[in-house]
């Protein structure tokens, strides 16, 4: 706790223009509308500022938790009094590269990324137009829907590696993408900064029509009018979580103000004043009942944040390409290092 206070004081002194919220309730920063106060929430305006914050935290043997759009996360009611969160909400640069690929920073919403691709006659991200997440968060979990996944469109990512305070570029293959998984979930100390997406040329009107069709399908089937963290459970191999939950008779099952959606059993919704404890108990009950009914052990898809988060100071798990060229500095991807 003492180290955290020192780091906060240092950051305030060195970065007076930084948006820094203290003891901020995280219920206001996630789609579930659940969560107590975090000790500090920083919202840097660019990658250079983000890297400076990370540097000051590392000086005090601390690591931040990186928050995207907060659309697949459950914060604890008790809050996170020893945690420093960095939001990527303002990291929203996006443009076409000379070779036709799309460059997007971590805070760009997936909906805006898909729309930008459509406007430029590029197909392959139609599935992402209705996913309420960001590029950074989406890549960490390899977000997908309707048969598409981000791994199918991404070419490379740039990350800031906290233990070494360096920028690295990873190819798609190095990211080890799997179903709702990636290298970044297993490797501590990674902060995704940006990505390049390689898409195929297509017809803009046809792409827009497909996006409208998928979004209408989403509105028809999903409880978009209630707070949630998206799909509560990962899809088990050869089956669907929603179908298993429905067959177990749990559609509409409720604990406090947390409820298995009556519209789509794969969602847990906040009916008004749900607590994280309500959600924990409901998910435990659902997993137990589904296992008893079908023998399938459901695995949570949403991120359930623990009360503590520490930097694991271990080396890169894969060979990485170090970036330190002046061009990266000009593009806003540079690491200040001090």
Regions found by a protein language model. Give the residues of each.
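Structural signature of FAD isoalloxazine-binding scaffolds in flavoprotein oxidoreductases
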Residues: 35-36, 42-47, 74-92, 140-172, ...
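Short, flexible micro-motifs
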Residues: 38, 71-75, 110, 136-141, ...
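Phosphate/pyrophosphate- and phosphate-bearing ligand-binding catalytic cores of soluble enzymes
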Residues: 21-22, 73, 160-162, 166-284, ...
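Conserved active-site and cofactor/substrate-binding residues in soluble primary-metabolism enzymes
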Residues: 2, 6, 27, 45-48, ...
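A generic local secondary-structure boundary/capping motif
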Residues: 72-73, 114-117, 125-129, 142-149, ...
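Short, basic and Ser/Thr-rich N-terminal targeting/leader segments
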Residues: 60, 67-69, 153, 226-227, ...
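Anion-binding (especially nucleotide phosphate/pyrophosphate-binding) glycine-rich loop
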Residues: 2-135
């Amino acid at each position: 706790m003492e180290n955290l206070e020192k780091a906060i004081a240092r950051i305030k002194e060195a970065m007076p223009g930084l948006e820094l919220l203290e003891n901020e309730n995280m219920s206001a920063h996630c789609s579930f509308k659940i969560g107590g106060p975090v000790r500090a929430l920083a919202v840097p305006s660019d990658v250079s500022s983000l890297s400076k914050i990370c540097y000051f935290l590392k000086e005090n043997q601390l690591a931040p938790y990186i928050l995207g759009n907060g659309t697949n996360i459950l914060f604890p009611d008790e809050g996170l009094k020893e945690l420093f969160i960095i939001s990527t909400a303002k990291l929203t640069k996006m443009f076409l590269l000379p070779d036709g690929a799309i460059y997007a920073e971590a805070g760009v919403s997936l909906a805006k990324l898909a729309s930008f691709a459509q406007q430029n006659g590029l197909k392959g991200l139609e599935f992402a137009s209705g996913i309420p997440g960001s590029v950074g968060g989406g890549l960490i979990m390899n977000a997908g829907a309707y048969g598409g996944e981000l791994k199918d469109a991404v070419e490379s990512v740039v990350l800031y590696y906290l233990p070494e305070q360096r920028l690295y570029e990873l190819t798609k293959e190095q990211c080890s993408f799997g179903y709702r998984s990636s290298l970044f979930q297993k490797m501590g100390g990674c902060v995704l900064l940006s990505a390049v997406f390689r898409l195929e040329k297509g017809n803009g009107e046809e792409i827009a029509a497909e996006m409208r069709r998928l979004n209408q399908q989403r509105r028809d089937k999903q409880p978009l009018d209630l707070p949630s963290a998206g799909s509560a459970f990962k899809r088990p191999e050869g089956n669907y979580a929603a179908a298993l939950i429905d067959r177990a008779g749990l559609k509409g099952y409720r604990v406090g103000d947390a409820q298995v959606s009556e519209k789509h059993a794969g969602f847990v919704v906040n009916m008004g004043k749900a607590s994280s404890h309500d959600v924990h108990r409901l998910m435990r009950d659902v997993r137990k009942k589904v296992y008893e009914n079908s023998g399938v052990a459901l695995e949570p898809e949403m991120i359930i944040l623990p009360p503590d988060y520490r930097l694991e100071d271990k080396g890169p798990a894969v060979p990485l390409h170090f970036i330190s060229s002046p061009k990266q500095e000009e593009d806003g991807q540079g690491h200040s290092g001090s």
